[in-house]
Regions:
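Ribonuclease/tRNase effector modules and their secretory precursors
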Residues: 1-106
Length: 106
């Protein structure tokens, strides 16, 4: 999946002190979150449990250096607003690698 197909009119990212500081607790930089959205393979899942006020999604992907992250985000005014980001846990890495393999074999 490509972000350009998922969000063809993407206008960038929306950062503020709140989402920056939350990610730093997990030692994840803003630029790492952004890289995840532009590297393939990319696995995006809806997050209905946390989508009360707005639709949230979780993206599983990797940075340019290969760090595997889960980034929870929402879309606001054609911008990606990152809610949280952290390293994938072991089972999430297994899920991501399996889903990524399926994408490649399509």
């Amino acid at each position: 999946m490509r972000m350009t197909t998922e969000y063809p009119e993407l206008a960038g990212f929306d950062w503020d002190d709140g989402n920056r500081s939350k990610n730093l607790k997990h030692v994840v930089q803003n630029w790492e979150c952004e890289q995840v959205f532009f590297n393939e393979p990319l696995v995006i899942l809806d997050d209905p449990r946390h989508s009360v006020a707005e639709d949230r999604r979780a993206v599983f992907g990797h940075t340019d250096s290969g760090r595997k992250l889960v980034v929870v985000y929402t879309m606001r005014n054609r911008r990606i607003r990152v809610i949280s980001a952290r390293d994938m846990k072991r089972k999430e890495r297994q899920f991501y690698e399996s889903a990524a393999k399926d994408q490649i074999n399509i």
